[in-house]
Amino acid sequence: MFSIIFSNPVKPFNSVIIHQIRFFSRDPFPNKVQHYLYRANLIDSIRLSLRSPTTSDRTLASLLNHRLLDSFVVKNALRSSPSVSSAWSIFKTLSHKSPRFSFETETLHAFATVLAKFQRSSELNSLIGVVNAWKFRNVHFSFMNLLNLYATAGDFDSVLKTWDEYRCSGEEKKGCTESYNIVMQVYMTLGKDSEAVQTFDQIINEGGIPNSRTFTIMIEHLVKLGNLDAAMKIFETLPLMRITRTLKHYSVLVEAFVDAQRFDEVKTLIAEMKSDGKFPSRRMLEPLKRMREAGFEHETEEFLREMLPDERIKDISMYSMDNPSDSEDEGDEYKDDVNEAQVKLKPWLDPKALATSLKKWSSDAVTALEEANFVWTNLLVCKMLRNFRAPETAWSFFCWVAIQPGFTHDAYTIERMMAMLARNGQVELVDKLISKVRIEGIKLPFSTIRLIIDLYGISKKPEAAIKVFNEDRTLCGSISDFNLMLLYSSLLRTLTKCKRNAEALETLEDMMLTGVSPDIQTFSGLMYHFALQGEIQTVERLFSMVRQIGLEPDPYMLKLLVQAYCRCERSVLAYRVFQDMKDSNLMPDRETKELLVKSLWREEKRKEAAAVEESYEEENDNKNSSNVLRLALKGHVWTISSTDISRVYNLYRDCVLKTST
């Protein structure tokens, strides 16, 4: 059900396209869909040519010399190369026999990626050297390109060397999160466990924002060291930090726990995966099969049924762009004449490019789409919806595909559509889908309801968010206290984004009355918002509520308060918070300290400014910065608390160092 492919070989379409070329002197394609399909045919011809033992170099040269060949076709043909020699064949043929073709950034990057994938470091370095010598005009490899290429190629020395150059270049202040992730993974692969931990520590110290992939690497590292329980604890902490749990997280853990025959944990992960609205990746197929063989048929039946290949999908076999067959029957006849070992492939398909070709939804484009005979699976439709830019086009496609033979929308496709509509403020259409879901008895994942509420904050639709929270959250079934707290937090954040301060405070009161306590991040977000609005009494009331419900003010909360008070020109209040931090043996980071000092000077509080400077100097003189708040974490007002990140870091460090010693 979830395979991506054409229902019929695309051979008949070739003759249609070639026929069309005669009538269109400027643009041989009446619409972008037919252009996409022609490109797909050409890519498939090249793919088959590279894999067939009977195909001559002349055939490949003929395909690569086609007058409609472009960088898009070359890029994807290179990416589909089955070997380095195949990629070199494309590269050399284009260089020597196709003078009209000019290598661009995307084609050279694709070629470099193939060399890296097959770990041909010397050839990769040669290509990088040629590119850096400006032999290909304006083509350039950035530091991030190089880090990714070297890491893929397994050239870890070059990764670390490039990382040092990157940090010294000034291209980024300290380096983006993904650069830290690459280095962290390299150290993990090399078995340099303490260096991997130090790299994670660097992300925090240098103001980076750990993302989902950061925690993927951490979980993989712990699994590699045999610390499955610690890996599971990290995974369970992610929702607290509002970090999205990805399919990669689930795949790594499911595989590890199946290997350890700890099937209770696997059942928990499967249930969580459904709640998060995730569908298993291919990597999970074998572990789930093994789990079924161990007697857990009921738990795995749904996923395995949908992961099996779709019988409607047919392979493509050898055909030529220059001599296409006119029918399926002729194609079958051709198959009988070739060797039994003939190459067969699933047709090439790029959901992003196909969605882009439908940018202008028209009757001609729809006709071309129908004639292509795609098998519309739920996974393909999800990928298409993700890549539409305009909600109107996405909605037209969503409605059109609903009436295609053999296709039925499910919770996954509905979530994709709802997310786009909510982000763009299309409240009526979201309500229409919700009504349909309710009538048909479809159960939505909890993550869908929460996502809609979050996205209504972006589109500034607070009433719609309140309506979803109050009336539609039952569509995901029973909600745990923890998930209800997350849902309340999302609603509060949306209301503050929309400047609906009164409703936010009413919602907070309702939350407390129902016995659901906000976490420290929610309080931090509210206090920061009201401090920026200049509502100091509300901030103080919220601060007292933190202690009333038994929470300890988070160091990051105190830091946020200092920043907020400074920005609304209440530096005296910021100084009081600074004193509270000092009394608790904490100091803000340098950036926050400098903001406080500037604010105090601006408001002519010179004595207080000098006291802050003196306190900071004393701390440095003690040569013990362990009590200096290290968390910059810009942009994480509502998400990561210093307590959570410290707990994760300590767990990771202790497990890794204990195992290493």
UniProtKB/Swiss-Prot annotation:
Keywords: Repeat
Coiled coil region boundaries: none
PPR repeat feature ranges: 139-173, 176-210, 211-245, 246-280, 410-444, 445-475, 484-518, 519-553, 554-588
InterPro entries registered for this protein in UniProt: At5g66631-like, Pentatricopeptide_rpt, TPR-like_helical_dom_sf
Pfam families: PPR, PPR_2
Domain of life: Eukaryota
Family: Belongs to the PPR family. P subfamily.
Protein name in the entry: Pentatricopeptide repeat-containing protein At5g66631
